[in-house]
Every structure is written in C-alpha cells, then in structure tokens.
Amino acid sequence: MTVLAQLYYKYGTMNSGKTIEILKVAHNYEEQGKPVVIMTSSLDTRDGFGVVASRIGMRREAVTITDDMDIFAYIENMFKKPYCILIDESQFLSQKNVYDLARIVDELDVPVMAFGLKNDFQNHLFEGSRELLLLADKIEEIKTICQFCSKKATMVLRTENGRPVYKGNQIQIGGNETYIPVCRRHYFHPPIKA
C-alpha cells in the first residue's frame, strides 16, 4: 500500500511551540539526508525577513511567501523535490496560497505541514487558518497553558501598555510584549487593568 502525502494543519496560541516544532521536524528529516523547504509569511518580520525563529533562540532561513506567490510552481520547478514542506505563520497565507499547498500534496505527492494561529485577538479566524481548516487532511492543536492560570490557552489576548485591547487591525506583528496566551475566562476577564 502506498502512503500518500497529506496536508497537515497544526495550530496553537502564541507561545505554544509551533516554530520549535517546525525546526525539530526539519532537523529530523535532514538528519536522514532528506531535504525540506521551510517557508514563512512575508508579513512576519519580527526576526528579519525570511527568517523562522523560536523564542528560545533557534533560527533558520526560510523562503518568504507573499499573497500572490505561486507556491506550487516554486516547488514544482525545484531541481530536487523536497521530502516535506514546513510553513510557519500560516495564518497569514491567502486562500490562493493554501490552495497551492493542497495542490502540492495532491499533484506532487509532497507532504506539507502548516503551523500557525487559528484565531486572532478578536477571536476571528485568519484567512489562512480558515482555508487550512477546510482543506487540511489532518488537524492538530499544539497546546499551551493560560498565562494567568493552569487551564489550556485557547485564545490570544492583545495588550498595549499592559492593558487588554479588543479592537483594532487584525494583523499587528508582535511577540510576548503584545500577545498573551489565555483561556476563555481570562480572555474576557484578564487580571490586568482595562
């Protein structure tokens, strides 16, 4: 029986270890002599353009994805087909980008693992997340705990000057200084001043 490639969507809140997982998977493939392609959204420039970096200091160069990039053609035209494609910040992908990833799996038989946030600070799905939830063959939650208690964090609280923010642009690039992983209770009632 032939094992066919699949599209995986692994989501979690901020600080759940998504990027560490990407770097670990890449290392495991490459230790076996199997090349991978790491890609990330061009919107995330926290650690530099075309860089995937974890909060614990691990980092790798990555191919940047723009909304109009033809990811399918990029992979199809590579001299050596990768064994796996790893996507960071997949919430920022466009519908076209996600459809390209599905085509890579279905037509090129290359597995794709997309990692990202599911919902924004207002609890709305990102475009990339919505499309991945619709098209992924396997969906997995990467869990972390609420910053204020021991419950599972399922939401992201945006803060500004130490205060919760519930309105504003969907995309505002930031890290631990801006976004906090929280449970539902502490999203609606954070133990910080509003």
UniProtKB/Swiss-Prot annotation:
Positions of the catalytic residues: E89
GO molecular function, one term: thymidine kinase activity
Binding site for ATP: G12, T13, M14, N15, S16, G17, K18, T19, D88, E89, S90, Q91
Disulfide bonds: none
Record keywords: ATP-binding, Cytoplasm, DNA synthesis, Kinase, Metal-binding, Nucleotide-binding, Transferase, Zinc
Enzyme class per UniProt: transferase
Reaction catalysis annotation: thymidine + ATP = dTMP + ADP + H(+)
Biological process annotations from GO: DNA biosynthetic process; thymidine metabolic process
InterPro entries per UniProt: P-loop_NTPase, Thymidine_kinase, Thymidine_kinase_CS
Subunit structure: Homotetramer.
Protein name, as recorded: Thymidine kinase
Native source organism of the sequence: Streptococcus mutans serotype c (strain ATCC 700610 / UA159)
